[in-house]
């Protein structure tokens, strides 16, 4: 029962216990993580090709991901708008010129291309490709170890997290409203509650959530989680500039775990420098919770 939990948490914790001071080593780890994400998504695509009843399973993936992201985002937006009304976050910043949102979206969609390539190769049916699942398990353990090191050495201290009240509050609201959305999805999609809650715990970190859920629930749920969280990032990129004028909390919350990296430039240019600390704290908390919550619900 707890083997899946241990596979996720042990390498993550061991990595988190390792302090690194050399920036060169951290750059190497970041590059390795990028390559390993592509590798595991490639394995995910191969695993999809070996599914029985392939056509019906692909329709199930599309159905699960479309319903899931719609319900979760609606729950997030409702809760974050309520937060903004009760605890306003004033915006006095004049928006700067934004980075190309099309270029950012294409960068995200490259990961979809890796899954598609793996799927196409898997359709060849070569016998050795059936070991893709085992290969992804070993790669996942190393990836989680490196993620632990990355989280430990990203410059955030406990004091900084505690002091940034807005980032913490928005993160809590996102977690609670996402899990409520997960419960609703369990009812709508007729999924086990723990499966739906695990799918709701990706918070936009599609490269990790898809991998972890494939390991725990199989390639159908894992792929649905991947597209669910990828859609969250793409939607956030498109909505932030217009939304941030009305509700800064909602704009930040929609970014999920990506607010500390991928969507941070958009948040900074549209919301100002005072939004950066909250965005980093918010993204850090959610990034830390993704593997923990998924491991918990998977067990």
From Swiss-Prot:
GO MF, any single term: L-lysine efflux transmembrane transporter activity
Transmembrane segments: 1-21, 31-51, 58-78, 109-129, 131-151, 169-189, 207-227, 277-297
Membrane-protein topology: Multi-pass membrane protein
GO biological process: L-lysine transmembrane transport
Keyword Membrane: yes
Protein localization: Cell inner membrane
Pfam families reported for this sequence: Lys_export
A GO CC term attached to the entry: plasma membrane
Consequence of gene disruption: Null mutant is hypersensitive to the lysine antimetabolite thialysine.
Swiss-Prot/TrEMBL induction comment: Repressed by arginine, via the ArgR repressor.
Keyword check for Lipoprotein: no
Record key words, sorted: Amino-acid transport, Cell inner membrane, Cell membrane, Membrane, Transmembrane, Transmembrane helix, Transport
Function description: Mediates export of lysine.
Family matches, as PANTHER family: LYSINE EXPORTER LYSO
Family: Belongs to the LysO family.
Protein name as annotated: Lysine exporter LysO
